[in-house]
Swiss-Prot record:
Keywords: Ribonucleoprotein, Ribosomal protein. Transmembrane segments: none annotated. Belongs to the bacterial ribosomal protein bL32 family. It holds the Pfam family Ribosomal_L32p. The gene is rpmF. This is Large ribosomal subunit protein bL32.
Length: 68
C-alpha cells in the first residue's frame, strides 16, 4: 500500500486539483441538417460527418395491422 512521504498541505493539494475540472464540449451545428452535434463526431440525426454520409439511416418500416 502506498504511504505518503510528507504531508501535502491543503493549498498544494488544491493547486494540484485546479486542472482537474471537466469542461463541457461546445456543440456544433451539423452542416447537413442543422442539428446540434458533438465536435468531431457523426451527427446522430442524419448520420453525416465531414460532408459525407457515414451511417446510413434506416427508413421507417410501416407494419400492417394484420401482421401484428
Amino acid at each position: 500500500m502506498a504511504v505518503q512521504q510528507n504531508k501535502v498541505s491543503k493549498s498544494r493539494r488544491n493547486m494540484r486539483r485546479a486542472h482537474d475540472a471537466l469542461v463541457a464540449a461546445n456543440p456544433n451545428e451539423c452542416g447537413n441538417c442543422g442539428e446540434l452535434k458533438r465536435p468531431h463526431h457523426v451527427c446522430a440525426a442524419c448520420g453525416h460527418y465531414d460532408d459525407r454520409e457515414v451511417v446510413a439511416q434506416a427508413d421507417e418500416i410501416e407494419l400492417d395491422e394484420d401482421a401484428a
